Amino acid sequence: MSMSDPIADMLTRIRNAQQVDKVTVSMPSSKLKAAIAAVLQDEGYIDGFEVKGTQAKPELEITLKYYAGRPVIERIERVSRPGLRIYKGRSNIPQVMNGLGVAIVSTSRGVMTDRKARANGVGGEVLCYVA
């Protein structure tokens, strides 16, 4: 069975793993998933990630982060999806929780946070919100 939305699958795996206090979570890898994981690591939402396996079937392993026994990621939700893509210009990129969370945006200059996109003066597809 083909997966219609691999990014939503990635976010759901992270959410489910944190609900049962898993240390790591694995999923099929792609360049976009690795870029999203890199943004999550830069922002301090995960401890790290690693691409494992063969080139034919790479696996992305994410090490989750907890603080005082609770997951660091309180909320992670998909915004743009295959049935309804959400694109925002550089002046319309949304803030999450008045700047306490991040929106992950896919731009022509790569995957970045809403703050970096505004600083670089680029818009793009709003992939997800993380808080």
Curated annotation (Swiss-Prot):
Give the Gene Ontology MF terms in alphabetical order: rRNA binding; structural constituent of ribosome
Domain of life, per lineage: Bacteria
What are the recorded Gene Ontology BP terms?
translation
* Segments passing through the bilayer: none
Alphabetized UniProt keyword annotations = Ribonucleoprotein, Ribosomal protein, RNA-binding, rRNA-binding
Recorded hits in SUPFAM superfamilies, A to Z, give: Ribosomal protein S8
Q: Which Gene Ontology cellular-component terms appear in the entry?
A: ribonucleoprotein complex; ribosome
Instruction: List the InterPro entries hit by this protein, alphabetically.
Output: Ribosomal_uS8, Ribosomal_uS8_CS, Ribosomal_uS8_sf
Q: Which Pfam families does the entry link to?
A: Ribosomal_S8
**HAMAP family, per this entry?**
Ribosomal_uS8_B
* Assembly with partners or alone: Part of the 30S ribosomal subunit. Contacts proteins S5 and S12.
Q: What is its biological role? A: One of the primary rRNA binding proteins, it binds directly to 16S rRNA central domain where it helps coordinate assembly of the platform of the 30S subunit.
- Would you identify the family this protein belongs to, as annotated? Belongs to the universal ribosomal protein uS8 family.
- Record's protein name: Small ribosomal subunit protein uS8
Q: Coding gene?
A: rpsH
